[in-house]
């Protein structure tokens, strides 16, 4: 019987647009991709709001998706594997390069000037195939600006403060060239997930393709 994999997207992203590439991580498995906008429906209760997530064998969560997943950790089934890509546990941590004030400013800005705001994030995500970057931008521009703003507000006002119970294997991938989630911040996730295996990708930025594949 095939394993079930769920993919939880980052802010302004839908990992499903890269399905053909990403399923290579486990080609024999059944894959379900959850877009950012779907995460925003109940970002602290993913196991309730996303049908089938509780029965998944593996959950891959990228950026914003990882924060939502960890905030929902009380409902994580025993033995469920997590793969966290450039995870966020405290976006405005003093070592992360973001302040609450800056993120709140971007939250206001994205509703008035969506493309310049997205471009400022794109610059921080590191190098990747140009077609991958173009697909991300094209998808993000179609999203509701108010939902994007709410996502930024959520990022700067929610964090994981206590270590999470070890219920299953957890692997963390982070990129040395990621300027959106700095490596120093990614490494600090060991305070929240002390049993997690941390893997640095020296030539990777923020993109799931270069982090995981």
Residue ranges and their predicted role:
Residues 91-137:
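Helix-rich cap/lid subdomain of alpha/beta-hydrolase
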Residues 74-109, 148-156, 212:
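Flexible "cap/lid" loop of the alpha/beta hydrolase fold
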Residues 134-161:
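Hydrophobic, aromatic-rich cap/lid helix
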Residues 180, 198-213:
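Catalytic histidine-centered segment of alpha/beta-hydrolase-like enzymes
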Residues 1-44:
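Conserved HGGG/HGGXW glycine-rich cap/lid loop of the alpha/beta-hydrolase fold
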């Amino acid at each position: 019987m095939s394993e079930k994999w769920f993919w939880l997207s980052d802010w302004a992203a839908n990992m499903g647009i890269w399905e053909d590439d990403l399923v290579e991580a486990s080609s024999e498995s059944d894959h379900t991709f959850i877009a950012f906008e779907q995460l925003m429906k109940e970002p602290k209760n993913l196991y309730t709001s996303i049908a089938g997530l509780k029965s998944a064998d593996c959950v891959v969560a990228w950026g914003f998706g990882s924060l939502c997943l960890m905030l929902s950790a009380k409902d994580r089934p025993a033995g469920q594997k997590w793969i966290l890509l450039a995870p966020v546990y405290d976006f405005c941590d003093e070592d992360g390069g973001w302040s609450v004030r800056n993120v709140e400013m971007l939250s206001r800005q994205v509703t008035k000037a969506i493309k310049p705001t997205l471009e400022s994030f794109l610059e921080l995500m590191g190098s990747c195939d140009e077609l991958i970057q173009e697909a991300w931008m094209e998808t993000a521009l179609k999203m509701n600006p108010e939902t994007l703003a709410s996502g930024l507000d959520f990022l700067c006002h929610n964090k994981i403060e206590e270590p999470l119970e070890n219920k299953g294997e957890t692997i963390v991938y982070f990129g040395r060239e990621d300027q959106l989630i700095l490596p120093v911040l990614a490494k600090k996730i060991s305070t929240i997930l002390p049993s997690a295996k941390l893997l640095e990708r020296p030539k990777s930025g923020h993109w799931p393709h270069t982090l995981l594949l």
